């Protein structure tokens, strides 16, 4: 948010750390729509992803959570609520590679970070971000709203909501 905007357009990631005498760098979690990413911990766990946020008042779905940071042998950072992916962990030589985590589809959640490989031929990529969603909301009192179509149509209080989880057309006759 530089320059600052209202409403907020996201939050910062958490700080990582490089412990003295260690060869690993442990990552902070990625920022989410509703909160900042967490710092990596003194016991070498990656930072948690920042929390997501609901898209409109009355929406019970949380979206756009941050991805977790890379951790030490103790583990990668937790996924941020709202579809973020968990971070991978550093692997000691001979340890099995940890799974890479992608953000949840249709949430816009961030992917978890990659980890240090167990060997020179291992590659531990970070996870992909989750596909996004488009939400169009308008007052139920809008004239002709029953002819407006596209996406999945629901109501929330006195509003009509059209949710698109895939490519589609929003038709206003």
Task: Give names to the regions the model predicted.
Residues 1-173:
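Low-complexity, glycine/proline-biased repetitive segments and flexible coils/loops
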């Amino acid at each position: 948010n530089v320059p600052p905007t209202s409403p907020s357009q996201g939050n910062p990631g958490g700080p990582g750390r490089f412990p003295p005498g260690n060869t690993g760098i442990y990552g902070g979690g990625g920022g989410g729509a509703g909160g900042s990413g967490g710092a990596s911990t003194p016991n070498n766990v990656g930072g948690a992803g920042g929390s997501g946020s609901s898209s409109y008042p009355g929406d019970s779905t949380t979206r756009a959570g941050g991805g977790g940071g890379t951790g030490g042998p103790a583990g990668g950072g937790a996924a941020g609520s709202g579809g973020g992916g968990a971070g991978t962990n550093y692997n000691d030589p001979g340890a099995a590679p940890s799974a890479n985590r992608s953000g949840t589809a249709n949430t816009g959640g961030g992917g978890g970070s990659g980890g240090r490989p167990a060997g020179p031929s291992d590659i531990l990529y970070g996870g992909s971000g989750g596909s996004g969603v488009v939400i169009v909301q308008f007052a139920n009192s809008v004239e002709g709203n029953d002819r407006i179509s596209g996406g999945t149509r629901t109501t929330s209080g006195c509003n009509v909501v059209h949710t698109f989880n895939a490519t589609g057309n929003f038709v206003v006759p």
